Design a protein with these regions (language model features):
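Substrate-binding/active-site clefts of carbohydrate-active enzymes
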Residues: 1-109, 122-138, 142
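Solvent-exposed beta-hairpin/edge-strand motifs
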Residues: 403-415
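Loop/helix patches that line or flank the sugar-binding groove of alpha-linked glycan CAZymes
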Residues: 233-403
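Conserved, mostly hydrophobic/aromatic
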Residues: 9, 37, 105, 116, ...
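C-terminal beta-strand-rich structural cap/linker in extracellular carbohydrate-active enzymes
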Residues: 420-451
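Short, solvent-exposed turn/loop segments enriched in Gly/Ser/Thr/Pro and often Arg
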Residues: 1, 48-57, 118-123, 146-151, ...
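Conserved alpha/beta catalytic core and glycan-binding cleft of carbohydrate-active enzymes
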Residues: 131-132, 137-293, 297-299, 379-381, ...
Length: 452
């Protein structure tokens, strides 16, 4: 099991230690692990599951004060977690327990961020208290979570820390299922396609995701989809992702929804999806192994893939490192996109106002094409302007560019901070690919023509 059966919230899982039967070994080895990761420039976020407990009758909460720590509907226990029970975060001592627990992990283990499982089961005031307490430890600690519940909760909807209420919180983020489903199709319909896999009329959904679910005058919500509302108050509240440990991997989803397409075309779709992810405003999140076309095979499944592998063996859940050598172009593409994003602060604007003032969508484009420019008037930005184009069509399109000469840093094959060539007036964007260009950036390194 993935570890969503919490018993003692403040104790490290023993199965990862060399000696789980001695508590000090668990503690010391986890601290050593985090220290080593920090020494290598890697921050550590922890998935926390305060929304339910593994057992109810035998839990320490229930034994301490029966029924106080759990929500009920009449004589029945509410099950907003989908796991048999849900904790009552709105009650003073449950709220205090959650706040004390995250502060303990932050101070004792130096955890850098907390990802709240089924955050919608928790009330808004508790999440505000979590943010306030962690700010006193370190304001840079991340707080984000799943902005939904796992079932019907007894907590009134207006009090739930769901995605649609996230604007009422400060510096607390939520996963964007809008960009997830917009890129690849619904996770609940294996055959449903998205922008990169051939679904028409997804342009507005992608534009909505590009601005991190914040208000923008050029985004028409009625065309973006039923779920799309400006739920994000600031771009940092939108956790953008295509796949995570839940549901099908990105590659497996494409294998099912686009089974009739060639593997080469599905690789293009994967690259285009990653380009949308890493050039959108907000916080990019990726599943480990996505850069190597991670798959979760399951011969017993009707599709051949595992979409809910919480209890599946290593044969399914392990990262197939041997496959990296077969898909180095995809791996290097992800590396290049990450490097480009890190190099350009205009892709990481911190306020909705900055996005509104600096990001302009191009008009008069072909169907299934999204394009926009960003003015370089963002603190730390080295380019005067950035242009981003996504082509969801199987065929090439031509897009007119603003005046001047542009350096191409990302195309359908390569990505990074080096110029792959220049364009002026207009540019051709290959089918199922992205093109990212910069203007007036002296930091761009030129790539020899034969290497472009």
């Amino acid at each position: 099991n993935w570890g969503y059966d919490p018993k003692n919230y403040n104790v490290p899982e023993g199965s990862y230690s060399t000696d789980p039967y001695h508590g000090e070994v668990r503690v010391n080895e986890m601290k050593q692990m985090i220290k080593t990761l920090h020494e290598n420039g890697i921050r550590v976020n922890m998935d926390v599951v305060y929304n339910h407990t593994y057992h109810l009758a035998d839990s320490w909460f229930q034994k301490t004060v029966p029924d106080y720590y759990y929500r009920k509907n009449g004589d029945h226990y509410s099950d907003g977690s989908g796991c048999g029970n849900e904790t009552a975060s709105e009650r003073a001592m449950m709220r205090k327990y959650i706040v004390d627990s995250v502060v303990y992990w932050a101070t004792e283990y130096h955890i850098d961020g907390f990802r709240f499982d089924l955050m919608g089961v928790h009330d808004l005031d508790t999440m505000k208290a979590v943010r306030k307490a962690l700010d006193q430890v370190n304001p840079d600690i991340m707080v984000y979570g799943e902005g939904w519940t796992g079932g019907e909760s007894a907590l009134p909807a207006a009090q739930q820390a769901t995605k649609n209420n996230i604007y009422r919180l400060d510096r607390v983020g939520a996963f964007s299922d809008d960009i997830r489903d917009g890129i690849k199709g619904s996770v609940f319909d294996f055959l449903d396609k998205g922008f990169v896999s051939g679904k028409d009329n997804m342009e507005e959904n992608i534009k909505f995701s590009v601005v991190a679910a914040t208000p923008h005058s050029q985004v028409t919500l009625t065309k973006a989809g039923d779920k799309c509302t400006n739920w994000s108050g600031q771009p940092g509240q939108s956790i953008n992702y295509i796949s995570c440990h839940d549901n099908l991997t990105f590659w497996d989803k494409l294998a099912i929804s686009n089974a009739d397409d060639s593997e080469a075309d599905r690789v293009k779709m994967n690259k285009l999806g990653s380009a949308v992810l890493f050039t959108s405003q907000g916080v990019p999140f990726m599943q480990a192994g996505e850069e190597m076309l991670r798959s979760k095979p399951n011969e017993k499944s009707e599709t051949g893939f595992d979409e809910n592998s919480y209890s599946s063996p290593d044969a399914t859940n392990s990262i197939k490192w041997d496959n990296k050598g077969n898909v180095m172009d995809v791996y290097e593409y992800y590396k290049g996109l990450i490097a480009f994003r890190k190099a350009h602060s205009a892709l990481r604007m911190t306020t909705a106002a900055a996005i509104q003032n600096n990001l302009t969508f191009m008009t008069g484009l072909d169907a299934n094409v999204v394009a926009y420019t960003i003015q370089g008037e963002v603190q730390g930005e080295t380019a005067q302007n950035i242009a981003v184009i996504y082509n969801g069509n199987p065929d090439a399109v031509t897009v007119n560019l603003p005046a001047g000469t542009w350096d191409i840093c990302v195309n359908g094959k390569k990505a990074g901070c080096r110029s792959l060539g220049t364009a002026e007036g207009s540019v051709t964007v290959e089918g199922i690919s992205a093109l990212v260009l910069v203007q007036g950036d002296d930091t761009v390194n030129k790539v020899p023509a034969e290497d472009a």
